[in-house]
């Protein structure tokens, strides 16, 4: 019975993903072959609430973080805090003439974030919290912070994917932070939801 209910919920999410709406783009220069990533929203996402889809890197053809509408600001705040820590560590490295380091940061990113990915079909992982510790790396002039998460499908435990997002500059952080503006992105989604609610 529980499995049937879960399948029905995921089917609703799948319909929503297929009806995703483009909101805008953020830039990230970690992969020189692709520097522009989509930010979209769906009206029936996590917990059947409007959710934001942030395109990221991963092993599947399409890879997304999913943030429900109530967590947009907390996700933005998390990336802001991570940016400040990135700036701080770069300063420490420069002051101490450190040119090579690979270190796990004791600074977990908090916020309930799910994942969606697609190869031949869509898969979803909603039962985890994006709370793993990031890695900070310096090698020569390259300075990066990487979040990576192995995710497993809610509907099939044998379907897994690795998704990740890497920041190589303050500009990478700022581009994502700026588009995750609850006052604009959240207001846009709530406006669409409000219009839908008048037709009952």
Where are the regions a protein language model picked out?
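Sec-dependent N-terminal signal peptides
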Residues: 1-17
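Positively charged, low-complexity terminal tracts
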Residues: 19-200
